[in-house]
């Protein structure tokens, strides 16, 4: 989806791979100046080669203090995509404190922190903005082994609504994109069992999983003025799964 974001500055977390990486590339092509945030420096090096001029930031968003040091002075941002996430699979009864804490620190707490940093700057500058939280279909339905992960995404749904309510008076829109399994490295690991993948795909009326481009297009739409009256909402990129 071709949009024009010329003159705007965007920040994308989880920018090293998959949805985040392709979002950075799409925003770059569309004229935005992009701050790309990920914890893997090698991914930033290759991304900078693909998208000359982006601003790479290497930080583990699961670390509150490190995130504050890295992004506290990031400067003016008009568009924010909270995409960073980990999918740590463990049965509910076996879920460890380490897995629980890591899941919530990266998937939810970092969204809270980075959004605070960006929104405060938007308000101080007196400019409108758009924030998109990359959630998941499992914010509404879940599967065995995803207790921690799906809990973070369910909480993100309410965080998105709360942010939209409180930031709306400042002309800051907040929405989420909630995809089904996306054919990224993370998505392929979740469906590495062929039988599980077959059964899961059959529950989608369109008999397919999502491509990265499908999710990126929804993110771009929500970032753009084409969704100027949309806030506190979720777009489900799920091939009809919830309808079934």
Curated annotation (Swiss-Prot):
Gene Ontology cellular-component annotations: mitochondrial matrix
GO molecular function, a single term: L-xylulose reductase (NADPH) activity
Gene Ontology process terms (BP): glucose metabolic process; xylulose metabolic process
Compartment(s) where it occurs, according to its Swiss-Prot or TrEMBL record: Mitochondrion matrix
Active site: 149
Record-listed E.C. numbers: 1.1.1.184
Keyword Mitochondrion: yes
Pfam families linked: adh_short_C2
Binding site for NADP(+): 11-39
Induction notes from the record: By glucocorticoids.
Gene3D superfamilies: NAD(P)-binding Rossmann-like Domain (3.40.50.720)
Entry-linked PROSITE patterns: ADH_SHORT
Tissue: Lung (ciliated cells, non-ciliated bronchiolar cells and type-II alveolar pneumocytes). Low expression in all extrapulmonary tissues, including adipose tissue.
Keywords: Allosteric enzyme, Mitochondrion, NAD, NADP, Oxidoreductase, Phosphoprotein
Keyword Zinc appears in the UniProt entry: no
Additional record remark: Uses both NADP and NAD as substrates. Has a strong preference for NADP.
Protein function: May function in the pulmonary metabolism of endogenous carbonyl compounds, such as aliphatic aldehydes and ketones derived from lipid peroxidation, 3-ketosteroids and fatty aldehydes, as well as in xenobiotic metabolism.
Quaternary structure annotation from Swiss-Prot or TrEMBL: Homotetramer.
Name assigned to this protein: Carbonyl reductase [NADPH] 2
Organism: Sus scrofa (Pig)
């Amino acid at each position: 989806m071709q949009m024009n974001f010329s003159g705007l500055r965007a920040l994308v977390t989880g920018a090293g791979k998959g949805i985040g990486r392709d979002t950075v590339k799409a925003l770059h092509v569309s004229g935005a100046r992009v701050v790309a945030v990920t914890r893997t420096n090698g991914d930033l090096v290759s991304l900078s080669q693909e998208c000359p001029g982006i601003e790479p930031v290497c930080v583990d968003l699961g670390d509150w203090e490190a995130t504050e040091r890295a992004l506290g002075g990031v400067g003016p941002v008009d568009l924010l995509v909270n995409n960073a996430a980990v999918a740590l699979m463990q049965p509910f009864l076996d879920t460890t404190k380490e897995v629980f804490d890591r899941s919530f620190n990266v998937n939810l707490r970092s969204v809270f922190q980075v959004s605070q940093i960006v929104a405060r700057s938007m308000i101080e500058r007196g400019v409108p903005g758009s924030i998109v939280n990359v959630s998941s279909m499992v914010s509404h339905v879940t599967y065995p082994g995803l207790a921690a992960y799906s809990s973070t995404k369910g909480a993100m749904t309410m965080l998105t609504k709360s942010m939209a309510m409180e930031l709306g008076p400042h002309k800051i829109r907040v929405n989420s994109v909630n995809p089904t399994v996306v054919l990224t490295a993370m998505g392929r690991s979740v469906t590495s069992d062929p039988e599980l993948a077959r059964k899961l795909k059959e529950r989608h009326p369109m008999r397919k999983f999502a491509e990265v481009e499908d999710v990126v297009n929804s993110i771009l739409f929500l970032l753009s003025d084409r969704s100027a009256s949309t806030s506190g909402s979720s777009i489900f990129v799920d091939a009809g799964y919830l309808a079934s």
